[in-house]
A protein has these predicted regions:
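SAM-dependent transferase fold signal centered on methyltransferase-like domains
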Residues: 1-127
């Protein structure tokens, strides 16, 4: 299993069945993907891997997480689909603090990178 040092162009979120089966290490190795963090179960790659069993997103921007960022983010992203992986706040807590409404074409992933840095990753669905 390879762990990424920096985010690349694409973000991969495995189907729930894959996570429950425990095959998340195998899929990363076979498809040459980099894991964001040991406990995040999110992956990244430079080039698109269309065979991935799950959702694929194109990374648009990455924000370093802070309380100040949450308050400012609503002005730029009033509506988004939020997901958390290996992150101290729940989706409900993030929504409450940021006032970002559910829906739209933007997907925000709140997660922790291998370095321990907490980030929000702005993406749009690719596949």
């Amino acid at each position: 299993m390879q762990v990424c040092q920096t985010l690349q162009n694409y973000l991969y979120e495995p189907h729930a069945a894959l996570l429950k089966s425990g095959a998340f290490k195998l899929i990363a190795t076979r498809l040459n993907l980099f894991k964001l963090h040991r406990h995040s179960h999110l992956y990244t790659s430079e080039s698109l891997c269309q065979d991935f069993p799950g959702r694929i997103f194109t990374i648009e921007e990455t924000y370093e997480f802070s309380g100040k960022l949450l308050k400012q983010l609503y002005r730029h992203i009033p509506k988004a689909n939020l997901t958390t992986r290996n992150f101290p706040l729940t989706v409900a807590e993030l929504r409450k603090r940021s006032n970002i409404k559910e829906g739209g074409d933007i997907y925000l992933f709140a997660t922790t990178l291998y370095s321990g840095q907490r980030v929000l990753i702005r993406t749009h669905k690719t596949h």
